[in-house]
């Protein structure tokens, strides 16, 4: 009996040490800026490599106290997941402000999960344990609010008004629309109907979002996320949609063609680039891209 208790205690200590080791893991490569990766907490952001921006932006932000008073009680009934990058300018600006709002609300930090993601091409906006899997994390920071283990809403990249006002909308009316609504719409279609469903919905999406999407990078970044997680067919479908939404943007065609090329669809890639060159005959990047595809 005593032996079993000792073994159990050793196992618990080992588990605790393992968890402690994986929290606030820093990746430090010679010649590169260090960054946090995986689950982190506030103490990790107060580390010497991050405190210059975290502490400064935390102190400078002054939440609207009247809104804080209105949201603080109800906010405690939600759990929150926050995905960020310590390498990301938006995360450096917005995450300290979000912490300031949570602290002003006396929010229980054990209900907050913070995950730092990578910017490396083979792990783009992913974490080692893939806490982001299936959550459509295409921009950071992304803050997801849960009630009874179900997603209620999210704030993407930056608040529409302010964190406290956006949170108030989410917990009171919940007619809140975060940034990058076209990505949300496309992701929902892919999850429910796949690429065939996206193809069927293309005309409707173009009619709904034409002129409302700020740049080709809204869908382009999302396509990169899909490609990086081996959802190749879906990435190609998204890049194809992007060429229709931004026909005057040569880079939209290059993203599609390069993805087709690396996935063994060389002839289709050539067709895409030749069409783009007909539309943009003066663009040397398209011509170079076509030559590269043809010779590989």
How would you describe each model-predicted region?
Residues 111-145, 163-171:
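Thioredoxin-like thiol-disulfide oxidoreductase module
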Residues 139, 144-183:
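Non-catalytic, surface beta->alpha helical segment in thiol-disulfide oxidoreductase systems
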